[in-house]
Each structure stands twice: as structure tokens, then as C-alpha cells.
Amino acid sequence: MTRNFRERKMPGVEIARIAELLDPIVVAERQLEQISVYLDLLLKWNARMNLTAVRDPEQIVLRHFGESLFAARELFPDPDATGSLVDVGSGAGFPGVPIAIERPGLSVTLIEAHGKKATFLKEVVRSTRLTNASVQAIRAEEYVGVADVVTMRAVEEFASILPVSARLVRPGGRLACLLGSPQAAEAEGVIGECWRTERTVYFPGSTQRVLWIGQRAQK
């Protein structure tokens, strides 16, 4: 008899433990299974290429998955939300892949110029059966199209991302960045007339990490 997937062990973290670590974010069983498969792949690939500096599996769940799922719910409170999202410089897939898992009604495009990382992302999409996500192995400047929301993390110079973001986000759409609090403070001084800060929210349990959400001007 097949055991409930919550009881099965994965090479990284048991599925039931993933659910505990993500608490108070409650994740459906199907999504937990996808997260577990994703985490397993990330740990295997990270052993031979630099996808994330965080090596401890539980810390990956707490920080990377926790922050990404929090962002999903802040950006799209409705579980049945639809629309388009582009994740720029997706790298290991955060926050784009967890958002696609958490909000299956969205159309999510993962942009990653680094060939090996793009290959990893394609394997994640295939293995987790993410029918609402696709990968483009290009630079953000080469992407054709606009989205309702653009997401980014590991932003080094906030001012440098704004011109590219303005081209990718539809008028009235949003840019969401996972930042350190000093970078969020920097954002206020450089966003210019094209953007306005919608809100800045600290991630649960953190005084250093924030989700900055800006809205593009209508014109």
C-alpha cells in the first residue's frame, strides 16, 4: 500500500517537516509535494553548481520558500488569481517557481540568461509538472512582452533595474523585489516618476528582509 505522501521521506526534508517549517503559511498537499520535488532537485544540482549560498535544507525552506510563498500571497491574495508574472534573473527559481506552485492560475515566465541555470529551471518545471510556468534562456532586455507583475530578488543596485522593469511591466502593473531593508530604503530615493511605492512589508520573523512592491504609472 502506498503511504500518504506526507509520510514519505525525500533526500532533503520530509514533506511533513516542510509543512511545519512553512507554518503559519498553510500549503495544500499537492503544492507541498511539488515543493518537495523542487527542493530535492535544488539540493542535488546545488552540489555541482552555485544555485544558492544557503546549503542547509531547512534554511532553504524557511528563507527561500517561505519568502516566496509570502510574496505570492501578498501579491495575489485570491488563490484563484489569474494574470501574468515574469521573474527576472530567476537563478534557482525564487520567487518565481514557488509563486507558480502556489497560484496555479497565473502564467509565469522565468527569465534566466545563464544557460546551466536555465537548464535547471526547465528540469524543475518538468519534474514538478508546472503547466503554468515556462523558462526563457535570455537576458531581461531581450524579452518581448509585458506582464502584470515582475519579480526580482538579490538586487544589488536598485536604480539599475528600474529601466528594464518599466519596459516589462504594463502601465498600472507592479514590480515586486525581495530586498534587504537598506535596499528598500534606497528605493524611495531612486524610483522617480515612473513608479510609486505601493507598500513595503517585512517578511515574518525578520527585521532585515522586506518585500518591496511598486506600481508603474499609468502613463
UniProtKB/Swiss-Prot annotation:
It is found in: Cytoplasm. It comes from the Bacteria. Its main location: cytoplasm. One of its GO terms (cellular component) is cytosol. This is Ribosomal RNA small subunit methyltransferase G. PANTHER family: S-ADENOSYL-L-METHIONINE-DEPENDENT METHYLTRANSFERASES SUPERFAMILY PROTEIN. The lineage of its organism: Bacteria, Pseudomonadati, Acidobacteriota, Terriglobia, Terriglobales. InterPro entries: rRNA_ssu_MeTfrase_G, SAM-dependent_MTases_sf. Gene3D superfamilies: Vaccinia Virus protein VP39. Its EC number is 2.1.1.-. S-adenosyl-L-methionine binds at G89, F94, A140, E141, R153. Belongs to the methyltransferase superfamily. RNA methyltransferase RsmG family. The keyword rRNA processing applies. Keywords: Cytoplasm, Methyltransferase, rRNA processing, S-adenosyl-L-methionine, Transferase. SUPFAM superfamilies: S-adenosyl-L-methionine-dependent methyltransferases.
